[in-house]
Regions:
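MIDAS-like acidic motif and immediate structural context at the N-terminus
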Residues: 1-8, 12-30, 34-68, 72-89, ...
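Von Willebrand factor
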Residues: 55-58, 62, 66, 71, 479-542, 547-555, 575-582, 618, ...
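Acidic, polar low-complexity linker/tail segments
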Residues: 368-438, 445-450
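VWA/integrin I-like adhesion module and closely mimicked acidic/polar interface patches used
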Residues: 407, 411, 546-600
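Acidic, Ser/Thr/Pro-rich low-complexity intrinsically disordered segments
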Residues: 452, 650-652, 656-692
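C-terminal GPI-anchoring signal of eukaryotic secretory precursors
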Residues: 754-772
Length: 787
C-alpha cells in the first residue's frame, strides 16, 4: 500500500497537464478514434524502456486524472486555474491509484509528445463530463416547443442539456473509455487483493474521512465478519461479502465493480435500493461519426446527474475484465509485448494473436464466460462502502449498502445484453491496406469542414500511422502545402486547425502537378541520401467535383505530366469528378496504368468516400523497388536492403518499373526471412496469370532472377512481387513491429538500371526518355487496382 505522500493523487491539475487547461487549452482537432489513440501510445512506447506493467501504471499516473471540471463562476488569472478534479469520477480514480495500483510516474510525456498530442491523450483517457452550457445546444440538442415554453431564466451558470463526455474514443465495436481498459491491464499485471481493514487503518485513506465514520465502519466490519473466512488463492474466486479477512481485488475496482460502486454511492442514498430507479448506461451520440470530436450525453433531466456508469465505461469495463484474464499468460509468453499491441489486436477482426478468439467482435460470448454476478456483487459492495466514506457526507450502514448494490447489479445485468447487441459487429475477413504517400488536392466544391471530414476518414482507412503511410493536403489553386505530408493524424489536424490559408476557389491543375513533381524530386533525393532501395509509392488524389480545367491549363498540364513521367515512375494519379473527360486526356503517352478515374455522382463527401474506398483503399497500389542513383564524377551510390513486415492474412505488394529493367542482362531480387515465421513470395510480369512462388522458411532467403528482363524495346512489363505470411511465431519484438505476429523480411536487389537524376548523369535524360514510352504495355499489364 502506497504511503509516500509525494506519490498520492491530488485533485489539482498536475504541472505536466497545466498546458491542457491554461487559456482553455489547445484546439484538439484530431478525431477521438482508436487509431489516433494507438498512434499516441506508440510514440510513447517507442522512446520508453519500460515493460508493459510499468508503462501502463506510469501512463495512468502521468496523463490520466478523472473528474476534472471547470468551476461554475471562477475566472482564470495568473494565479487561479478554474479547473480541478472535483467531480465524482475523481474519488474512484484516487482510491485506485493510491491503494490498489500504487505507482510512480516514470514517463516523461513531454519528451515524446507535443503539447497537442499530450493533451489529446489526456482527454482520451481521463473520464469526466463537461457539464456547463456551451452555446451550441440549439444545434446539437434542440428543444421541443413544450420544453422551450417551460424553461426558466437563471442568473447562475446553466448546465448543458447535452454535456460532453470526455475520456472516450470511437471503435468499430462501440465507443469505449480507454482509461478503464488500461487500468484493467495494469491491474492484471500487478494483481492484488487489498484487505478492507488495512484500507480503513491506512493513513492515506483515513486522513480525509471523519473519525466518526471511521469508527462506525470498523465496528461494522468487525462485528459482521467474526464468523467468516475467505479463500483468496484466485483473484477471480467467489468471496463472501462479510468474510473476516474481506478484501477487494484491484482488477474489479479498475473495471465493472468500481463503476458500479459509483452508481451505488451517488444514486443509492437518493433513490433507495430499487432496481427500477437506479440508472445504468447512457444515451450518447457523436457530433460526427466520420470526424468524431465530441461525444454528447443526451440526458433526460439537466438538473440531475445520471451518468455514473455510461455505455462507454460499461463496454470498456467488460473489455478490460476480459483482457485481464489473459494478460499474465500473454506477457509470460512474450515479455516484449506492448500495450498498444494488445489493445489494437483486441479491437481488430483478427483478434489477439496468442488467443484469436479474444476480440471485441466476440465480446458477447466472452462476457458470458467471464462474468460472475456473485463476484460482481461482492466486489462492488465492498468497494462502494470504501468509496462512500470518502465521497459522501452521510454514513450509509453496510447492510443498506449491500441492498443498494444488489439492486444495482440487477439493473446492470438487465441492461448489458441490449448494449452488447447494439454495439455488436460481426467478425470480418481482414483486408489489405495499401501503403502509400497520399497527396490530396481539391477544387472549390469543398470547404474547410468537408476537407477535414475526408482527411479524417482517409487517415483511418489507410491506417496512416500504423502502416507508416503519410497524407498531405495541397491547395488546389496555388499548389502550396496546406498541410505537408505527415504520418501523424494528430499533428496533421493541428496544422490544419492552425492554417491561415484560404480554401481554394478553383482547381489549377498545372500548379497541382508541379507540386507533385517537386515532392517526387525531394523524395527521390531523400532516397538517395538514405541509400533506400524501396519505399512507398506516391498517390495524388485530385478532387474536382465542380470545376473543369481550361484549354490552356490542359496543355500545360500535359507538358508537366510528360516531364514528371519522364523522371519519376512510381507516382499514381487519381481524378475524382462528375465529368472526367478533360482529365482522361492529360496523359496519353505513358500508358502504364498509373492513373485512375473516379466518377462522382455529386459533390458530397460521402459519395467521394464511397468511390475512394472502392477504387483506392480496397486496391493493391504496390510499393516501389527502384535502382540507385547513377555514378557522378566517380562517386558511387549504394543502397541498403529494405526491411518490411507482413501481417498474417494480409499481403504486401511491390513493383519494379520497366525503366529499371531495360538494357539490363540480369536483375536479381532477393527476399530474406528475418525469422518470425514462414513467408510466401510470388513474382509475375505484366498480365501473366501464372506466378512464380516460393516459400521461404525462417532465416532462409530466395532470389528471383530476371535474365534479359526486356527482350525487345517495345516489350517490357514491370516485375511485381507479393509477400504473405504462411505462419507466425509471435516473435516480432523490434520497435518497428506493429504487432507481435508480424513476420519481417529484407529485400535486396542487384542489376537494376541506375537513375540519372544528379550531376552529369542527368544529361542522359534524352537517351532514356523514349525508352519509357511503352506502347505495348497497355496490352500486357494489368491495371494495378485489380492485382
Amino acid at each position: 500500500m502506497l504511503l509516500d505522500s509525494e506519490c498520492l493523487v491530488l485533485p489539482r491539475v498536475p504541472v505536466q497537464l497545466l498546458d491542457c487547461y491554461r487559456g482553455g487549452g489547445p484546439v484538439l482537432g484530431a478525431p477521438r478514434r482508436l487509431d489516433v489513440f494507438l498512434s499516441l501510445l506508440r510514440r510513447l512506447e517507442y522512446t520508453s524502456t519500460l515493460d508493459m506493467r510499468m508503462f501502463s501504471t506510469s501512463l495512468l499516473k502521468s496523463v490520466r486524472l478523472d473528474g476534472i471540471e471547470e468551476a461554475a463562476n471562477a475566472i482564470e488569472t495568473d494565479f487561479v486555474l478554474p479547473f480541478r478534479a472535483s467531480a465524482f469520477q475523481f474519488h474512484k480514480y484516487k482510491l485506485l491509484m493510491d491503494l490498489f495500483l500504487p505507482s510512480q510516474d516514470l514517463l516523461d510525456v513531454d519528451e515524446s509528445l507535443s503539447t497537442v498530442e499530450k493533451c489529446l491523450l489526456h482527454k482520451m483517457v481521463s473520464s469526466t463530463v463537461q457539464p456547463w452550457e456551451r452555446g451550441d445546444e440549439n444545434v446539437q440538442c434542440p428543444l421541443s416547443v413544450q420544453q422551450r415554453q417551460s424553461m426558466t431564466q437563471s442568473n447562475q451558470r446553466v448546465r448543458s442539456r447535452c454535456p460532453i463526455e470526455d475520456g472516450v474514443i470511437q471503435t468499430h465495436w462501440g465507443t469505449i473509455s480507454p482509461g478503464t481498459v488500461i487500468g484493467a491491464i495494469a491491474s492484471a499485471l500487478e494483481s492484488q487483493r487489498v484487505s478492507i481493514t488495512d484500507i480503513l487503518k491506512a493513513n492515506v485513506y483515513k486522513e480525509e474521512v471523519s473519525q466518526q465514520f471511521m469508527e462506525a465502519a470498523l465496528e461494522e466490519w468487525t462485528k459482521k465478519s467474526e464468523h467468516y473466512k475467505e479463500d483468496e488463492e484466485d483473484s477471480f474466486n467467489q468471496v463472501d461479502v462479510q468474510s473476516s479477512d474481506a478484501s477487494i481485488n484491484n482488477i474489479w475496482v479498475a473495471t465493472l465493480a468500481g463503476d458500479l460502486a459509483e452508481v451505488v454511492v451517488n444514486q443509492g442514498p437518493r433513490v433507495g435500493a430499487f432496481a427500477d430507479r437506479l440508472m445504468v448506461g447512457s444515451n450518447n451520440r457523436w457530433n460526427d461519426t466520420i470526424l468524431p470530436r465530441d461525444y454528447y450525453l443526451l440526458i433526460q433531466n439537466s438538473t440531475t446527474i445520471d451518468w455514473h456508469f455510461t455505455d462507454a465505461e460499461i463496454l470498456a469495463g467488460i473489455d478490460g475484465l476480459i483482457l485481464a484474464k489473459y494478460m499474465p499468460t500473454w506477457v509470460a509468453q512474450r515479455r516484449t509485448l506492448r500495450l498498444s499491441q494488445v489493445i489494437e489486436m483486441y479491437y481488430s477482426n483478427e483478434g489477439v494473436s496468442f488467443e484469436p478468439s479474444v476480440r471485441a467482435c466476440n465480446r458477447q460470448a466472452l462476457f458470458q464466460n467471464i462474468i460472475d454476478t456473485t463476484q460482481l456483487y461482492t466486489e462492488a459492495s465492498r468497494f462502494a462502502h470504501i468509496l462512500s466514506l470518502r465521497q459522501i457526507t452521510v454514513y450509509v450502514p453496510l447492510e443498506e449498502m449491500q441492498r443498494i448494490t444488489e439492486a444495482a447489479v440487477s439493473t446492470f445485468m438487465n441492461y448489458v445484453p441490449s448494449l452488447l447487441r447494439q454495439n455488436h459487429r460481426e467478425c470480418e475477413v481482414t483486408r489489405n491496406v495499401p501503403v502509400v504517400d497520399l497527396i490530396v488536392a481539391t477544387d472549390a466544391a469543398w470547404k474547410g469542414y468537408d476537407v477535414e471530414q475526408f482527411m479524417s476518414w482517409i487517415g483511418g482507412a489507410l491506417e496512416v500511422d500504423a502502416q507508416r503511410s503519410s497524407i498531405g493536403l495541397l491547395h488546389g489553386n496555388t499548389g502550396q502545402w496546406i498541410v505537408p505530408p505527415s504520418s501523424n493524424l494528430t499533428g496533421f489536424f493541428d496544422q490544419l486547425q492552425n492554417s491561415t490559408v484560404d480554401w481554394p476557389n478553383r482547381l489549377n491543375l498545372p500548379n497541382v502537378i508541379s507540386a507533385v513533381k517537386r515532392h517526387s524530386r525531394n523524395q527521390t533525393l531523400r532516397d538517395i541520401e538514405d541509400m533506400s532501395s524501396a519505399g512507398h509509392s506516391t498517390l495524388a488524389l485530385i478532387f474536382s467535383p465542380s470545376d473543369r480545367p481550361s484549354a490552356i491549363e490542359l496543355d500545360r498540364a500535359r507538358d508537366l505530366m510528360m516531364s514528371l513521367r519522364n523522371s519519376y515512375f512510381d507516382v499514381y494519379f487519381a481524378y475524382a469528378a462528375q465529368d472526367l473527360t478533360d482529365f482522361q486526356n492529360i496523359n496519353n503517352v505513358y500508358l502504364d496504368y498509373s492513373e485512375l478515374f473516379l466518377k462522382l455522382p455529386s459533390t458530397s463527401v460521402l459519395d467521394a468516400i464511397t468511390a475512394v474506398e472502392t477504387h483506392i483503399v480496397n486496391s493493391a497500389v504496390p510499393m516501389r523497388i527502384f535502382g540507385p542513383q547513377c555514378p557522378v564524377n566517380g562517386t558511387e551510390y549504394s543502397q541498403t536492403p529494405y526491411e518490411d513486415f507482413v501481417i498474417p492474412g494480409r499481403e504486401q505488394n511491390y513493383r519494379i518499373h520497366p525503366f529499371y529493367l531495360r538494357q539490363q542482362p540480369l536483375v536479381t531480387t532477393e527476399f530474406r526471412n528475418d525469422g518470425q515465421g514462414r513467408i510466401l513470395v510470388c513474382m509475375w510480369r505484366g498480365s501473366e496469370t501464372s506466378h512464380a512462388c516460393q516459400t521461404i522458411n525462417e532465416r532462409d532467403s530466395y532470389a528471383f532472377n530476371l535474365t534479359t528482363p526486356c527482350p525487345s524495346p517495345d516489350f517490357c512489363p514491370p516485375a511485381r512481387f507479393v509477400v504473405s505470411a504462411l505462419s507466425t511465431l509471435n516473435l516480432c519484438a523490434h520497435k518497428d513491429c506493429r504487432l507481435p505476429n508480424q513476420v519481417g523480411y529484407y529485400i535486396r536487389h542487384t542489376g537494376t538500371r541506375c537513375l540519372p537524376l544528379l550531376g552529369s548523369s542527368a544529361h542522359n535524360n534524352s537517351l532514356w526518355k523514349a525508352l519509357v514510352v511503352l506502347p505495348l504495355i497497355s496490352l500486357i499489364e494489368l491495371i494495378f487496382l485489380e492485382i
